[in-house]
Amino acid sequence: MGIRNTLDKLEPHFHQGGKYEKFYALYEAVDTIFYSPPSVTKSTAHVRDGIDLKRIMITVWLCTFPAMFFGMYNAGLQANMAIGDGFGALGGWREAVTMALAGSHDPGSIWANFVLGATYFLPIYLVTFAVGGFWEVLFAVKRGHEVNEGFFVTSVLYALILPATIPLWQVALGITFGVVIGKEIFGGTGKNFLNPALTGRAFLYFAYPAQISGDSVWVAADGYTGATALSTAAQNGMSAVQQAYSWWDAFLGFIPGSVGETSTLAILIGAAVLLITRIASWRIMLGVFVGMALTAMLFTAIGSESNPMFGMPWYWHLVLGGFAFGMVFMATDPVSASMTDPGKLLFGFLIGVMTVLIRVVNPAFPEGIMLAILFANLFAPMIDHFFVQANIKRRMKRDAAYSPATNEETA
């Protein structure tokens, strides 16, 4: 009651004519964090549902937690194993915090691994939230509309697809590009045709490739270099991957990679909740999976003596790189994806096909899910257009078939 009374007392100052009317978006954002919006439908409701945008976004945000927490643990585990092999710790305040809270770099300690991983991920997330939130609030204030809860999701998704060692100034630059160029210049939430989180990562990928790809960015240990499992497969074939990791290692997430993308199991836990609550589209996920599996099997059947990626089975494509994360959390973005039911299947299928094509055919990009989703975002409006037009023509033919009989009965 104390929070509600305080907010009610402050509310008049933020309405039109009040002292702080320009900052109503900030007041509204704080109010809706603690309480549901007071607006209700007073006339006939065309959409009947007990869930609003805030609950949807918070649910998606919570569904990333399994991947987030395991990602922090795995980032620390990979670093501590490297330190145990003789590589040095990176030092700085992270080392001081780790020693104060965990006392060692023991890779056998769950707590030590989690603390070290958290010292890398949490700053990334906080910088993402602060900088991206600043741009969200700035555009909301200038346009006079509410701050949307969608940034809760954008911020965590963006942070989870970055390597743990990325410089924080690049984190800020990437989320700025993703929010401003990927969303706000098109009108804000609901009007963007590109996924903002992937747009920001794509900017970093092409502008600063040394800090977001390669062999030295995945494990937070001084002097350590090591390719991801997907890069190893692209360079040396599946035999080299299987010597280093089992399929279960990759499925559970005990491999180097971006913070939130390594554990397919943790990602699928979040996917189950999204599907049960019907927040994410099963059609898109199914389309992505089927497109990937069929294309991978086609390349496996064709084979190649010069390109080892031809021989990667579909079940390895599933657990390596960011495929699972992209399929569950990125491809299902309701704003930038197709909206018609058959369009969702085709949209997802296109992503799955292009992911494997980029991974196998283009040696410059061992990871293909990011570019595949962004390309599919560009095609989504056209996909929906063709399906809508086909539906209109089908209905017109059906109406034309019934109209003569109707006219005769009337006469």
Curated annotation (Swiss-Prot):
Q: Where in the cell is it found?
A: Cell inner membrane
What EC number(s) does this enzyme carry?
7.2.1.1
Q: Which residues carry this modification: FMN phosphoryl threonine?
A: T228
User: What's the short name of a Pfam family annotated to this entry?
Assistant: NQR2_RnfD_RnfE
| Keyword Acyltransferase (UniProt) | no
Q: Can you tell me where the transmembrane regions are?
A: 56-76, 121-141, 161-181, 254-274, 284-304, 309-329, 345-365, 368-388
Q: Name one GO cellular component term.
A: plasma membrane
User: If you read the UniProt record, what top EC class would you report for this enzyme, in one word?
Assistant: translocase
Its required cofactor(s), as named, are: FMN
The entry lists its GO molecular-function terms as: FMN binding; oxidoreductase activity, acting on NAD(P)H, quinone or similar compound as acceptor
Could you tell me which cysteines form disulfide bridges? none
Bilayer topology: Multi-pass membrane protein
Supply the alphabetized keyword list: Cell inner membrane, Cell membrane, Flavoprotein, FMN, Ion transport, Membrane, NAD, Phosphoprotein, Sodium, Sodium transport, Translocase, Transmembrane, Transmembrane helix, Transport, Ubiquinone
One BP annotation, GO:
transmembrane transport
Write down the InterPro entries for this protein, in alphabetical order: NqrB, NqrB/RnfD
Main subcellular location of this protein, as a coarse class? membrane
> Reaction catalysed by this chain?
a ubiquinone + n Na(+)(in) + NADH + H(+) = a ubiquinol + n Na(+)(out) + NAD(+)
What interactions and quaternary structure are annotated?
Answer: Composed of six subunits; NqrA, NqrB, NqrC, NqrD, NqrE and NqrF.
Record's family? Belongs to the NqrB/RnfD family.
Give the protein's biological function.
NQR complex catalyzes the reduction of ubiquinone-1 to ubiquinol by two successive reactions, coupled with the transport of Na(+) ions from the cytoplasm to the periplasm. NqrA to NqrE are probably involved in the second step, the conversion of ubisemiquinone to ubiquinol.
HAMAP family reported for this sequence: NqrB
Q: What is this protein called?
A: Na(+)-translocating NADH-quinone reductase subunit B
Q: Which organism is it from?
A: Chromohalobacter salexigens (strain ATCC BAA-138 / DSM 3043 / CIP 106854 / NCIMB 13768 / 1H11)
Native organism taxonomy: Bacteria, Pseudomonadati, Pseudomonadota, Gammaproteobacteria, Oceanospirillales
Q: Name the gene that codes for it.
A: nqrB
